[in-house]
Amino acid sequence: MKKLIYLLVLLLLLAFTACSEKDNPSEVKILGYKLDQFINPDTVRIHIDTQAEADLEYRSLFAYEIVSSTDGFSPRQSAYAGYDLPWETFSQGYYVPNDDHRTWFPGMGLPSAFKVRNAGLFRLYRKVDVDAGNRGSKLIELRGLSTYTVDNWSDTAEDAIKLSDLLQGIAAYDSVAFVAVDGYSKNYQPELINDGYYLLNSEVTTFPNFNSTLPGNMKKFKKLAKINVYGATSAQNFDFALAPQEKADLTFTIPSDLSGFESTEMVTEK
């Protein structure tokens, strides 16, 4: 009788263990920290304009490079990546200290190069998106373009880029719409684009040969975020250079003390 009871207990324990393993597979729970927490919105806003409205997302005006603190590696150097991330992608990533301080972008389909080991800092580069509809789109880092010295609206020399350089690779088009960070937009014809510049520090356009005849809201378009291209006859077949690292607009580091940051429990099966 005792042997029978012992056998029944043993069978129950084995059944319980089997069910437990089935219901709870081997999982490792680790903490991740959303990357957007490491990019201070006020610092970015003030860099764009000290008088800028605080309720707008100025971090969307930049491309983001993730850099290793040990060997300086970034996805820019990888043959499988070779680019920086827009805010919409970067902000959804995580910093995971328990996984060799790597960055994770779960479910986003990014190349493995973006899983940067010992991630230590982020470099920000001012960019503009150019959207030619079904002809494709480009993310263009402004400091990767040729710069020119142009008089700004205070009659002081300032670095600027040609507006036409943002449309390199498009054979012809009918018109464009400039879109600001707040969604405000204005249409421009090719002759204005070919004449105009974007002042990199003032964050405003100027059209040297047309300023005297243009209304203020056209000649001084501020905080350019995007260009919509209408009537493009071709895709934008041009390989834009990334901005040099030494010309990064802003840099943020990951602190060693993360006690002031919100963590997210992340689950991965081993």
Could you say what each language-model-derived stretch is?
Residues 15-18:
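C-terminal motif of bacterial Sec signal peptides marking the signal peptidase cleavage site
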Residues 1-2, 20:
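N-terminal hydrophobic targeting signals that begin at the initiator methionine
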